[in-house]
Structure formats: structure tokens, C-alpha cells
């Protein structure tokens, strides 16, 4: 492989890595994106509410409380985020959309995600960001899934498309809040996809080494996250236990029976009660308890099957112990498949790239991603979509404290994605 990653792209990726911001708190990140878009020069630029299409309603999911948003907002301001961008993103309306208009032709879009994870980054001297001085400056947050690289991919591709003989319209979506499956839906329903003929999504790594490209990722599990609150009646645990309605017993029964839901014959189904808690003291019958639940399915219908069964189990557990129960929707994403015509083009382009050492036509994700909202929207409108993997030899898995991206993958991504977009425009499959 020949590698020559431009210095300005490495610098951008490292700046974003130093300043990770979790879902709906990407204030500094959006400001840096706008800086880059204005440097390159685009025909239309939508920021915050304008990118999310809030005139059609606020469809954001899993938005933090105002005090959390305010803390990150002020932190971004202190770190030099632009006041005009802060004004447009205040309240957690992060993200951006750039549009490049270059004459007649199809409308082609690329979607990248921009948020970080609420996770402390390793300070081990063998961890490259720590060793080379771009470890997270935000304790308890890090880019542990490569979204700093994704933003950089997008900027690099935009530069290439602008300088090319591309004919058509190119849209670049910088989507917030993927990690909580909260930002895909509002961007999909923003109206900005209505004229998109072809859409590419991209992810780095996924256990594929640097130099390997997967032309089409499939096997996205549809997912739904929801929170549950049980409310019972407190009582003295020794003197009057019969007077209490035990919310923790309802919780425990719900957990056990959620995991007992029969798996479906038509495909993979999952349930996980990932966060649980309740009670205040050992001598008080617990008045309250909570659980955070996710269900998944190989298709959106199978996810719906698991959701229906889980809700029934939880409601029944609450009834058993005379407790009230309240559900709060947090986030969701449908399943999706990559269209073969686009997979063929990306696979051919990657195979001809001097930066690519190996290709795979397809692979299965086995997880969930809210890029599927955008893919589904384009496909439902008669267009085509595909999700591409750019390999990177990360030392440990995604969502770990020592995750990192080999920066050579930036060059691979920019080359393969930009040339694929040019080829799609030329062929119009």
C-alpha cells in the first residue's frame, strides 16, 4: 500500500480526538466541521436545527437534560467554539449538512457520524493518542468508535469531489448522536434526503485491518432502547412488610422473564436489561426501581416482536407486586441492507485502488446503527444505499479505553469513497 495522509487531515482527526463530545453535546465538533466546510467552500451549509429539519418537528431521541447540555456547551465555548455555531446548536441541536452543486447529474450523499462515547480514555504510554499527545482532554469521554476519523473521511472526500469533474449534487451529512441511536431519525426525516438518489454510509474498523475494504455491510439488527420505572409503596421491612408493594421484586421478576422470552424462528432476536437499580435502604420495602432495556431483531418486525413481549412481561411483573410502571422511549433504528448495484461499484473501485490490499464484497455487522434510518429513507424514495467498511488495525476492540485508528485508513477512505461517488455519478446504476 502507498500511504500519504495529508497533514491537515491528520491534524483535524487529532483535534477532534482531543475534544470528544457524546451525543447531542457535539458543540465544539460541529464548530470545527463548519470551519472546515467554510475553508473548502460549499454551496449550501445547514447547521443545527436547519440540518435536523426541526421545522418538521423535533424528532431527536435520547437528548440529555438541560444541565448536562449547558455544561458541555460552556466547555465548548471555553475551548474556542465559534459563537455563531454555538448559537445555532444551543440546546443540543448539533450536526451539519454541506451541499456541493456541480451541474446536472444525480444527487449523491455521504453520511458520517460525529459523536463520542462516555468512556475514559487510557493513559497507558503504549496507547498512541497518549504517547503522541492527542489523548482526550475530556475525562470520561473519548472517541472509542472512530467517529473522529469518520468526520475526517467526510472532509477529505468533500475536498476531492470539489476538485474533481463530478457532475451532479453532493450532500455530506454530519450526523450527531449515533451512539444513542438518536440522530439518524431526525436527519432522515429532515427533508434533505428527499432528492437523494444514492447514499453511502461508512464505518472504520469493525475488525477489518488497515487496507481492507468491505463494499457492503449487512446484518444490521433493528434496535429499540427504552427505560422503565416501577413505583410501589414503601413500608417497614421488619414491622410491616405486608403493607409494602415491592418495586425491586417487580424489577427482578421482569428481568428474569425478559430473558425467558422465546427467540423467534425467523431470525436473530435479542433482549438485554443493561442497567438496573432500586431501593433506598435495607430496612425499607423498595418504593421505586428502574431498568434500561434494549431489544433487537434481524428485521424491524422481529425487533417489534421482542419489544411487544418485553413490554407484556414488564407490565405483568408490575401487576404481580401491585406496582405502577412507566415506559420512556430512548432511541431506535430499523434494519437495512446494502443495494447490490452500489456494492458492486465500491468493490470494483476498492479493488483497483493502490491503497487497498484486500476487499470483501459483503460482511455482517451483527449490531445496530442508525444510519439505517437514512438508508431506508433513500430506498423508500426509490433510491439506493450502501454501507461501507474501511478497515483499520485497531489494537483493541471498539468501545474500549485503548481503541485507536491507524491514520493510514484516512487515505484509504478518502480514495475509495470519493472514487466510488464519481463512478456512481458516471454509471447511475
Task: Annotate the PLM regions.
Residues 59, 117-119, 131-142, 148-152, ...:
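Histidine/acidic-residue-rich, glycine-tolerant segments that coordinate divalent metal ions
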Residues 16, 37, 110, 147, ...:
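Divalent metal-coordination and catalytic microenvironments
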Residues 112-114, 224-232, 289, 390-394:
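Short, small-residue-rich loop/turn micro-motifs
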Residues 92, 102-106, 222, 284-289, ...:
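A short, glycine/Asx- and small/polar-enriched loop/turn
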Residues 252-429:
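Metal-dependent amide/peptide-bond hydrolase catalytic core
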Residues 1-142, 166:
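Acidic/His- and Gly-rich active-site-bordering loop/insert found
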Residues 13, 17-20, 41, 162, ...:
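Sec/Tat-exported extracytoplasmic proteins
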Amino acid at each position: 500500500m502507498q500511504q500519504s495522509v495529508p497533514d491537515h487531515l491528520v491534524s483535524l482527526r487529532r483535534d477532534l480526538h482531543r475534544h470528544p463530545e457524546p451525543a447531542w453535546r457535539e458543540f465544539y465538533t460541529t464548530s470545527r466541521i463548519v470551519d472546515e466546510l467554510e475553508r473548502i467552500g460549499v454551496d449550501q451549509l445547514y447547521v443545527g436545527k436547519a440540518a435536523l429539519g426541526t421545522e418538521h418537528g423535533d424528532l431527536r431521541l435520547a437528548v440529555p437534560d438541560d444541565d448536562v447540555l449547558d455544561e458541555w456547551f460552556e466547555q465548548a465555548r471555553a475551548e474556542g467554539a465559534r459563537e455563531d455555531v454555538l448559537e445555532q446548536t444551543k440546546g443540543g441541536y448539533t450536526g451539519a449538512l454541506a451541499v456541493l452543486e456541480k451541474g446536472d447529474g444525480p444527487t449523491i450523499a455521504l453520511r458520517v457520524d460525529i459523536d463520542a462515547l462516555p468512556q475514559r480514555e487510557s493513559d497507558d504510554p503504549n496507547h498512541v493518542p497518549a504517547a503522541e499527545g492527542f489523548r482526550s482532554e475530556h475525562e470520561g469521554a473519548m472517541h472509542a468508535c472512530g467517529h473522529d476519523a469518520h468526520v475526517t473521511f467526510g472532509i477529505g472526500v468533500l475536498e476531492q469531489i470539489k476538485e474533481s469533474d463530478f457532475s451532479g449534487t453532493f450532500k455530506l451529512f454530519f450526523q450527531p448522536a449515533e451512539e444513542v441511536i438518536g440522530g439518524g431519525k431526525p436527519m432522515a426525516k429532515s427533508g434533505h434526503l428527499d432528492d437523494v438518489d444514492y447514499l453511502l454510509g461508512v464505518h472504520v474498523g469493525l475488525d477489518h485491518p488497515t487496507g481492507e475494504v468491505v463494499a457492503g455491510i449487512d446484518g444490521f439488527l433493528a434496535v429499540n432502547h427504552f427505560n422503565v420505572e416501577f413505583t410501589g409503596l414503601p413500608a417497614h421491612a421488619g414491622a410491616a412488610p405486608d403493607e409494602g408493594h415491592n418495586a425491586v421484586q417487580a424489577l427482578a421478576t421482569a428481568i428474569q422473564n425478559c430473558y425467558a422470552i422465546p427467540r423467534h424462528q425467523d431470525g436473530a432476536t435479542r433482549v438485554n436489561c443493561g442497567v438496573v437499580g432500586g431501593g433506598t435502604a435495607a430496612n425499607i420495602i423498595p418504593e421505586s426501581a428502574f431498568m434500561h432495556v434494549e431489544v433487537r431483531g434481524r428485521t424491524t418486525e422481529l425487533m417489534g416482536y421482542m419489544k411487544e413481549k418485553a413490554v407484556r412481561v414488564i407490565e405483568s411483573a408490575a401487576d404481580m407486586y401491585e406496582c405502577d410502571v412507566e415506559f420512556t422511549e430512548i432511541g431506535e433504528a430499523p434494519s437495512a441492507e446494502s443495494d447490490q448495484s452500489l456494492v458492486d461499484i465500491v468493490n470494483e473501485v476498492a479493488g483497483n485502488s493502490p491503497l487497498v490490499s484486500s476487499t470483501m464484497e459483503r460482511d455482517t455487522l451483527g449490531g445496530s446503527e442508525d444510519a439505517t434510518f437514512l438508508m431506508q429513507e433513500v430506498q423508500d424514495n426509490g433510491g439506493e444505499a450502501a454501507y461501507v467498511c474501511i478497515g483499520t488495525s485497531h489494537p483493541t476492540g471498539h468501545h474500549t479505553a485503548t481503541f485507536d485508528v491507524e491514520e493510514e485508513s484516512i487515505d484509504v477512505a478518502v480514495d475509495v469513497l470519493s472514487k466510488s461517488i464519481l463512478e456512481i455519478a458516471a454509471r447511475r446504476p
